[in-house]
Amino acid sequence: SHQEVVPTSLRQQGRGGLKTPPLSRIRSLLGLILLGALAWAFSVDRSKVAWRVVLWGVGLQLIFALFILKTPMGAGIFDWLNTVVVALLGFTVEGARFIFGDLVYNNVPMGVGEAATNAPIQEMPGQVARTGASFAFNVLPTIIFFSALMTVLYHLGIMQWVVRGVAWVMQRTLGTSGAETLSAAGNIFVGQTEAPLMVKPFFETMTMSELHAVMTGGFATVAGGVLAAYVGMLLAYFPDIAGHLIAASVMSAPAALVMAKLMYPEDGDPVTKGQTNIQLKSPDVNVIDAAARGAGEGLGLALNVGAMLLAFIALIAMANALLG
């Protein structure tokens, strides 16, 4: 089981077991101030910065963090989300087993234990040897499954309701336009390719500040499939990791708008100012079509992730060899 192979020091770093030293909190505060100052310093027009967006954006992050960490209701939601994601990872294992059979390492933490294969890599640490196979047969299939699941939820209209709710809160507090806010909220759940498609009809009329906010929101969060992949990689070490990552993704949405509006303040008149009731239509005919399209998109993302890891790790190894 996980508890038998994971060091105690790592198992204790869940939501209740990890204590943040005061110095780390001060460092985080200084980092927040420094990053904000840098964004303001590089702003295209510092005189037009809307400080309402900045103050409310930071405030929303603090409010959400306090709700999750300091209230029983928030902690309950946190734990429930963690349980749901972990259960979904179990469903991924069933699909991966059908394709890969015994190559799927169920209930074995990635990166822990002896070498997983008899390949000539026994001189490498067992942690490294196990990681590759587990990543390929456990983590990458997770991206495919979650991509299909999110596409189905969008087709059924469930995710639209959630995204509109988050967008409504941010739009009412930050005062940003409906299109950029909706895209930022969508990035919490889907990737930076899919989220902007929600507001595609407004691209031609968007201001430069709005387009900048849409791009920033994409880089500030991760797609649902990638988030699930991170959960699969870290679950053995941090039992509450899913809740942590979901909380971080939600908090990153207003943070992205803060940074975007500091660097490129709004100087125009957005068409969707004050609107969040934008129709989000699914292009799929039925649930099967949605699942198939989502799986195909997830496959492309999984292949890209695997290819990038292979290429960059190999390049880093080559650089290390050249540097001696």
Q: Model-flagged regions — what are they?
A:
Residues 163-198, 269-290:
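Juxtamembrane inter-helical linkers in multi-pass membrane proteins
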Residues 250-303:
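Long, contiguous bundles of hydrophobic transmembrane helices that form the permeation core
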Residues 22-32, 138:
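Structural signature of hydrophobic alpha-helical transmembrane segments
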